Structures are given as C-alpha cells and as structure tokens.
C-alpha cells in the first residue's frame, strides 16, 4: 500500500496545501488502481466508464469525484458481484484492508457495491478518528440507449492504460440528462464544463428525456432553473472542487445557458 506522501509528485502543489483534499487524492489513486485492474479482466468488455470520475480522469475537470460509475450492457447481477469480488481481492493483495457492506434496496435500478476501507484515513495520518468512513461506491447501470464506445487513455499516479468510454457528445448528453432529472450542484458544474467543448448527442437525449434539438434543450434547462436555488446547489459539492471559489460559476448557470451558442450542436 502506497504512502500518501508518495502521491505528491502526481498532483499540483496547490492541491496539497488544502489538507481536506488529501483523502480525495488517496481515493483517486485507489480509483485508478481499480480501473487498471479491470482492464486485465473480461468484465471490461461489458462496461463503459461514465460519470463524474470519467470527467476527472479522462477529461481533466477541476474537481474530485467520489464513485466509479459504469454503463453496462448484458452484465448480470452475478457477473457484477464476481467483478466486484475480484476488485476486493485485488485491493487486499495490494495491501488494503477492505470489506463490503451492502443492504438490499428494491428501489435501486442499478447494481451497486460499497467497498469500505476501515481505519484507512486514520492509519494514513489523514484523520484523528479511527472510525472515519472511507469508501468507494461502484455502480453499474444499463443506460438503455445504444451508442458506440471508444477507447480513452487514462493516466495518473504512475499508471497508464486504456479504458472504454462514451464519445464526448454522449457523455455530455448523460450529464445533461442527469442534471434535468436530479439537479445536483455537481451536475450544473459538469454541464458548464462540457457544453463549451461539445454539444450533446440528441439521439441519447431524445431516448432519455424526449429532447431532440438544441432549442428544446435550452428551453427545458431554463424552465428547470426557475425552480432551483443555484446558490444553495453550489454548496453541495464545495468539498470536491480544487478551488472553492470555482463553485460560484454555478450561480451563473442561467446566464450561461441563455448565452449558450446553440450552433455548436449542429
């Protein structure tokens, strides 16, 4: 198991100035280990890396992410359990003390496994409390929309590997869909990161949200914003951003959408 201070060369010095970031740096290292391990298994053929951690590790967004999310096609629950059991055994071989604590949830449509690391923060000198919780949630869910994945290079903490990911426009559509359905602060932030780079895949959005053009998307986003306290939303992911001042951009989301250049989606 690596010493936390050995990760310093892989991260910008300013990130180490904030002690609160250290546990997320450690988590990112473990996320990279898990992804790298999965590339050695047959399960990687049935999953696509999505979500906020994709944005962090593939696209380079300036915030940490907490979970590993995958779109899965033709992956059974028993295969998911076998996949995550393999992850647990791999982490143990790497020197981590790990355990799973899962409660049945009939409302959950995804496969989910919570991997806990008892006393890891305490033993790493990142917390004065033995019982402080540290976990990585792994979630697989079929997005119910067909698209062609592509291979992306992922590198960090001395690791270098390829992993299946969605195209940028599909990833953008996934984030827009998530924003419209749950309105988490980090979703606003992520959409503001993605939309200037690529328009969303409207085939995906049409199947997920019934939106098939930029005009209707802009209308839906502005209608959604009218019921949301953006200042409040900007606070719910403050602990994840590299620079706490960056969360203020979420309060400008309405103006951002109003000025969004729709021709980028043509």
Predicted regions and their residues:
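Structured mid-to-C-terminal alpha-helical surface segments
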Residues: 1-32, 39-47, 58, 75-266
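Catalytic metal-binding acidic patch
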Residues: 52, 59-81
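Gly/Ser/Thr-rich helix-start
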Residues: 52-53, 186
